[in-house]
């Protein structure tokens, strides 16, 4: 990354925050979990306590509400689901243009792995992390890690 990219990345990061996250059953729209926390902070490992029933859903609708001071040409995120540090799944989401000085809600649907590939919650509990990298085009804005606990 060049000097201009680093400066742009820092400028976007300073004015960027996650306001809240909601996970819903994609089929019924029922809220399964929500948290009013800035999960974009890169300096800590965040924790999320998610109801165990989320593992039984066919698909989950994720809503991210975020604010940005700076405009973004191509806001996107890459997510890696890791089990004990090894990648189990990887997803790529692209939102596109984001206007400056706005608050936005971004909804995405994530389909579950086939049941034959699912592990029991007691094995997953505390051993799964979701690593999310937020980008504007190819410029990394922030990378966060969330450890999952199933309740």
From Swiss-Prot:
Q: Which Gene3D superfamilies match?
A: GMP phosphodiesterase, delta subunit
Q: Where in the cell is it found?
A: Nucleus; Cytoplasm
User: What keywords are assigned to this protein?
Assistant: cGMP, Cytoplasm, Nucleus
Keyword rRNA processing appears in the UniProt entry: no
Which InterPro entries does the protein's record reference?
A: Ig_E-set, PDED_dom, PDED_dom_sf, Rhodop-sen_GMP-Pdiesterase_dsu
Q: What is its main location?
A: nucleus
One matching Pfam family: GMP_PDE_delta
Q: Provide GO CC annotations from the record.
A: cytoplasm; nucleus
Q: What are the BP-aspect GO terms? A: sensory perception of light stimulus
Complex and partners = Interacts with Pde6.
The family line of this record is: Belongs to the PDE6D/unc-119 family.
PANTHER family, from UniProt?
Answer: RETINAL ROD RHODOPSIN-SENSITIVE CGMP 3',5'-CYCLIC PHOSPHODIESTERASE DELTA-SUBUNIT (PTHR12976), RETINAL ROD RHODOPSIN-SENSITIVE CGMP 3',5'-CYCLIC PHOSPHODIESTERASE SUBUNIT DELTA (PTHR12976:SF0)
What is the protein's given name?
Probable cGMP 3',5'-cyclic phosphodiesterase subunit delta
In the UniProt record, what gene is named as encoding this protein? PrBP
